[in-house]
């Protein structure tokens, strides 16, 4: 590890195979905590390369417990996190709106590391019991059109790294990796990323797969469609800038997306918004993200996807999906 760290600090890069080997070593406990922490922080000081990201992804997927969800044509709706914006759980709420529109969601999530509350924090506080059983994921999808894969249960080899990430409390390349290592390998993906550079890296990697994808990055730094300004959209077919007005929404202020200071705050917002009792700003932002997810799977216009998302939320079908999900996973 000393040699690897010296190379990285001197702005040298790892090959894809070297990156895979290092991450495999991290997983096996080959390195001490100081070495692991140093390795994680190097990538805050210099950009990660495509080859390094591919190697880290290869190791994570090789070490994970896979879930076979063939036939469900599911989508994962998630962000990398690490944007420092402390928004409410937009992608989690959006996922249930997508499920309420009868589009299958295979969501992969975790506890918050650099934020107050990740998707796992909110769902756990609502009574969800996490499972690492692949058959349980299928039962959940059949009952509610959504399943939730709590990352530590499907990536057990990463148990050595988790405590160090929590102690650091800052974004690391594991934030970049999270959306790429969904153990169900869903054929569709909506992913929000915290930088334009990472959006382009994701675009390059996904263009070399069979995945049907949409990658978003708000130009003011959000890892999702925030409606606080224009956002970059990269998909199989296009790379473009999109304004809130094009989607039929007004430009929002950052304060309107605040997620509170505790898990309890985040949970309350989740319940209020999913009950169609959220503010106009909260509703707009979840509908835009859910609408893009629906349109990605169905290959329709984003505005059509937003209309389906609105119907899901306003009819109560999104909340019904959550209630069925909770019943199956508690």
For the regions a protein language model found, what residue spans apply to each?
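Acidic, glycine/proline-rich low-complexity segments that act as flexible tails and inter-domain linkers
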Residues: 1-87, 101, 105, 252-257, ...
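Glycine-rich anion-binding loops and their surrounding alpha/beta cores
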Residues: 7, 59-65, 87, 102, ...
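A generic alpha-helix surface/boundary motif
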Residues: 17, 92, 117, 121, ...
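Short amphipathic alpha-helical face segments that pack within enzyme cores
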Residues: 38, 93-97, 285, 289-292
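A glycine-rich phosphate/pyrophosphate-binding beta-strand-loop-alpha-helix module
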Residues: 40, 88-144
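Conserved catalytic-core motifs characterized by acidic clusters
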Residues: 75, 110-111, 182
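Acidic, glycine-rich active-site loops and adjacent beta-strand->loop/helix elements
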Residues: 79-84, 109-115, 154, 219-220
């Amino acid at each position: 590890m000393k040699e690897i760290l010296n190379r990285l600090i001197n702005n040298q890069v790892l090959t894809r195979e070297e990156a895979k080997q290092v991450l495999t070593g991290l997983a096996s406990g080959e390195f001490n905590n100081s070495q692991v922490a140093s390795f994680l922080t190097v990538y805050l000081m210099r950009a990660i390369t495509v080859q390094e990201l591919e190697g880290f992804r290869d190791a994570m997927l090789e070490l994970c417990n896979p879930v076979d969800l063939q036939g469900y044509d599911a989508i994962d709706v998630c962000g990398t996190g690490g944007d420092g914006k402390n928004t409410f759980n937009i992608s989690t709420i959006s996922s249930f709106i997508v499920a309420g529109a009868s589009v299958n969601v295979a969501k992969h999530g975790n506890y918050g590391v650099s934020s107050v509350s990740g998707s796992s924090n909110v769902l756990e506080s609502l009574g969800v019991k996490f499972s690492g059983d692949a058959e349980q994921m299928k039962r959940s999808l059949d009952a509610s059109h959504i399943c939730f894969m709590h990352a530590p249960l499907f990536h057990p080899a990463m148990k050595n790294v988790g405590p160090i990430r929590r102690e650091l409390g800052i974004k690391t390349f594991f934030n970049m990796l999270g959306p790429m290592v969904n153990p169900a390998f869903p054929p569709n993906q909506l992913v929000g990323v915290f930088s334009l550079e990472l959006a382009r890296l994701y675009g390059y990697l996904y263009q070399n797969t069979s995945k049907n994808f949409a990658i978003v990055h708000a130009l003011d730094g959000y890892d999702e469609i925030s409606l606080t300004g224009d956002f970059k959209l990269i998909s199989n077919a296009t790379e473009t800038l999109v304004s809130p007005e094009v989607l039929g929404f007004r430009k929002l202020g950052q304060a309107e997306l605040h997620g509170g200071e505790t898990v309890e705050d985040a949970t309350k917002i989740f319940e209020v918004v999913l009950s169609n009792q959220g503010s106009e700003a909260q509703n707009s932002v979840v509908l835009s993200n859910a609408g893009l997810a629906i349109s990605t799977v169905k290959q329709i216009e984003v505005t059509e996807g937003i209309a389906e998302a609105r119907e899901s939320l306003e009819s109560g079908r999104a909340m019904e999906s959550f209630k069925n999900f909770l019943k199956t996973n508690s």
